[in-house]
Amino acid sequence: NSIIRQPVITNKYVDPLLSQNGDVLYDFTGGNAIIDDYSNIAFDTSLEWRPSDDTNYQVSAGMTNGSGLFFQDLGIGYADGSTYWGQVQATMGNWYAQAFIDHNDGGKSDNPTFLYGSGFRQVAERTTIEAQIQYNFDMPWLFDSEWTVGYDYRDTDSNSDYTLWGRNEDTDDYVTNGFYGQGTLNMSDKVDLVVAGRYDQASFISAGEFAPRAALIYKASDKTTWRLAYNKALSGPSALQMYIDFP
């Protein structure tokens, strides 16, 4: 489409007929509809404090502003907007923790995000919060093993003003969290056994899932290592796959 419009929402859904007369945001008539001139700027800063050899604190923040094309199943689109983020990290002995927040305004009416195929603006505002805590420890009595255990959490709050999630807008929770652990056991001078597991729970799926992993490593020489491994990987649907409700 050579004309990009503000969609008209009816009953929490983009009305494809009324939207044909929505407010005009871009008009590429007579020119190149695919924008080929765009720019990006970024700024970030970080403050680090090390009160001791095994203690470290870090605070970081930044922002980016820019635009560009994107390609997906729905076709070619143009994204514009600003992202603001902040992160705190702490390492204290065997403990590590971090928290992160990221907010993207999804583009405003004067610099919209849109799909060329539909010709409609899409609001893609989102806020993501992440947190993680991790602990490392040794078990000398169990094959001189080294272990890592942890927990992480992620919550993505989206707002599309009904232009993308439509009738799912008010029930689009997307929260994931999981526990994980990994250990390396020194079975002999040449053989290590690595065992790991992760349990994940998602707000959009009723049951959690466990993913195990194991590897037997044989160090035949300084230049040769053999590995026999088993791994089960999990991948959930994206928020777009779960909640899209768009004509």
Regions found by a protein language model. Name each.
Residues 1-79:
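Periplasmic-side early beta-strands and strand-to-turn transitions of outer-membrane beta-barrels
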Residues 2-33, 111-121, 163-170, 240-247:
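Solvent-exposed loop segments that connect transmembrane elements
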Residues 15-16, 191, 224, 234:
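N-terminal targeting/docking segments
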Residues 42-44, 180, 213:
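One-face residue pattern on beta-strands with alternating periodicity enriched for small/polar residues
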Residues 50-56, 60-62, 82-206, 219:
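Face-selective signature of the C-terminal outer-membrane beta-barrel domain
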Residues 81, 207-209, 232:
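Active-site-proximal structural scaffolding
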Residues 101-114, 203, 223-247:
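Surface-exposed extracellular loop regions of Gram-negative outer-membrane beta-barrel proteins
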Residues 204-226:
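Repeat-solenoid scaffold signature
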